[in-house]
Design a protein with these regions (language model features):
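An N-terminal assembly and electron-transfer interface module characteristic of large anaerobic redox
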Residues: 1-405
C-alpha cells in the first residue's frame, strides 16, 4: 500500500465514518483495522465506531465465516445504539472466498447488515469511497414530495481535520435559505433514508456514482462543485447553488466582498511577497480543485504541483519537489518529512492530519478560512530558519518594515 494513495478498504472506512448510529465492522486482518483506525483516532478519539473480527492464519485455511458470524453477534450485544453494521471485507476474505453475503443473510438480529466489498487490491482509496457510498442505496426511502431548498452533501469525510467546523460554517452561510438535509460527514441513518427528499445533491469530488443513481431512481439532480476555499471559492459555490435552486444569494455575496476587503487590508503587506512563489498541493479530490483555485487566484502563488493523493506516491512527490522546488507544501501529515528535508512550511489541511489537531471552531472555507490559511502560511514562513537570501527574505523585510512603522 502506498501511504498517500492507500487502498479501497481505507476509502470505505472513511466514507462511512460519519454515520453516527452505524458500526463499521472490518472483516479482515488486524493490520487493516490498525492502519485505518490510527488515522481516524488522532482527530476524533471520542467517536470511534469501528471494530474488526481479526482474521488469523487458521482462518485463512479454514475460512473466516465463523469469526464473522461471532463478530456480528458481539456487535449486536455491545453496540446497542447502532442501527446498522457495515461489514467492510478486505483482501484476505475475498481471496479465500468467504461467503460474506450469505453470512449476513442468515444472521438474526435487529441491526441492518450491509456488505461493502473493498479488498485493497481492487482499487485505491477513491474507489473504496464510491463503493461505500453506493452501499447506502438500500437504506434510501422514496419521498412522496421534495422538500424545497434542501441539499445533500457528498464527498467530505468525517476524518477531514476541519470537516465539522466547515459544515457549521457552511450552514451559517446558507442560513435560512437552504437546509442541509444530509451531509455524509455527520449524519444518522434517518438522515440517509430521507436523502431522496432533497431538491439537490452536492458532490465535492466524490459521490457522483451515488448521485447518478439517485437521479435515476428518485429524481434528485446533482451538481459537482469545488470545495469553497477562500472568498472567491465561496462566492463561486453560492452562485452555482443559487442558479441550481433559483435562490438569490446577493446579500451573502456582498458580505463576502466586505470580509475580503477587511482581510486584504490586514494581510496585503505580507501577501505581496508570496506572489508567484511556487507551492505544492497534495490532497484528495474533494479538496484539490478548490485549494488550487485559492492559491492561484486569491493568493497569486504559482501552483507547481497539484496532485490527487489517490494517484500519487511519496516517492513521486519527492521527485516533483526536487524538480520544482516549492517553498510551501499543503496537504496531510504525510508531507512532514518532505517539508523538513527542504526546510519549507507545511500547511496541514487534509486527511490524515495526525500531528496537528483542531480544538477550536476554526474553518478553512469562506473568508474565515482564507484568514486562517493566510495566517498559517505567513507564520510558517516566519518560523523557518533565517536566511538573508532565502525565498522568504522579502516577506521578512516587509514584516520588519510594517512592525517598525
Amino acid at each position: 500500500m502506498k501511504p498517500l494513495s492507500s487502498c479501497a478498504l481505507f476509502g470505505a472506512v472513511r466514507a462511512l465514518g460519519g454515520i453516527k448510529d452505524a458500526l463499521i465492522l472490518q472483516h479482515s486482518v488486524v493490520g487493516c483495522q490498525w492502519g485505518s483506525l490510527a488515522f481516524r483516532y488522532a482527530g476524533k478519539p471520542y467517536d470511534v465506531r469501528q471494530v474488526s473480527d481479526v482474521i488469523y492464519d487458521e482462518d485463512v485455511v479454514n475460512g473466516g465465516e465463523k469469526v464473522l458470524r461471532k463478530a456480528l453477534q458481539e456487535a449486536e450485544r455491545i453496540f446497542t445504539h447502532c442501527g446498522a453494521v457495515f461489514v467492510v471485507s478486505g483482501c484476505v476474505p475475498n481471496m479465500i472466498g468467504d461467503d460474506v453475503d450469505g453470512i449476513l443473510a442468515t444472521t438474526e438480529g435487529s441491526q441492518k447488515l450491509l456488505h461493502v466489498k473493498a479488498p485493497g487490491y481492487a482499487g485505491n482509496i477513491d474507489s473504496g469511497v464510491e463503493t461505500a457510498y453506493l452501499a447506502l442505496l438500500p437504506l434510501l426511502r422514496a419521498a412522496e414530495k421534495k422538500e424545497a431548498a434542501t441539499i445533500n452533501i457528498f464527498g467530505i469525510m468525517n476524518d477531514d481535520p476541519y470537516a465539522d467546523n466547515d459544515l457549521e460554517e457552511l450552514k451559517k452561510f446558507l442560513g435560512s435559505k437552504v437546509k442541509i438535509n444530509c451531509a455524509l460527514q455527520d449524519c444518522s441513518l434517518r438522515d440517509i433514508a430521507a436523502m431522496p427528499q432533497a431538491e439537490l445533491n452536492i458532490c465535492f469530488g466524490y459521490g457522483e456514482p451515488l448521485a447518478k443513481q439517485m437521479q435515476e431512481k428518485f429524481g434528485v439532480p446533482y451538481i459537482k462543485c469545488a470545495y469553497p476555499y477562500g472568498v472567491a471559492g465561496m462566492q463561486k459555490f453560492l452562485r452555482q447553488l443559487g442558479e441550481a435552486l433559483k435562490i438569490d444569494f446577493s446579500d451573502e455575496l456582498a458580505d463576502l466582498e466586505a470580509a475580503a476587503e477587511k482581510l486584504v487590508y490586514r494581510s496585503a503587506d505580507y501577501l505581496v511577497n508570496l506572489y508567484q512563489l511556487p507551492v505544492a498541493l497534495a490532497t484528495d479530490k474533494a479538496h484539490l480543485a478548490g485549494l488550487q483555485s485559492f492559491f492561484a487566484e486569491e493568493l497569486g502563488m504559482r501552483v507547481v504541483i497539484a496532485e490527487d493523493t489517490a494517484e500519487f506516491s511519496l516517492d513521486k512527490m519527492a521527485e516533483a519537489a526536487a524538480k520544482h522546488k516549492p517553498v510551501l507544501l499543503c496537504g496531510s501529515s504525510f508531507l512532514k518529512n518532505l517539508a523538513d528535508t527542504y526546510q519549507v512550511p507545511l500547511v496541514r489541511c487534509a486527511y490524515p492530519a495526525f500531528d496537528q489537531l483542531c480544538f477550536t471552531d476554526n474553518t478553512l472555507i469562506g473568508a474565515r478560512g482564507a484568514a486562517l490559511l493566510i495566517e498559517q502560511i505567513v507564520n510558517g514562513a516566519l518560523q523557518q530558519q533565517y536566511k538573508t537570501d532565502g525565498r522568504y527574505a522579502g516577506l521578512r523585510e516587509s514584516i520588519c518594515e510594517v512592525n517598525h512603522e
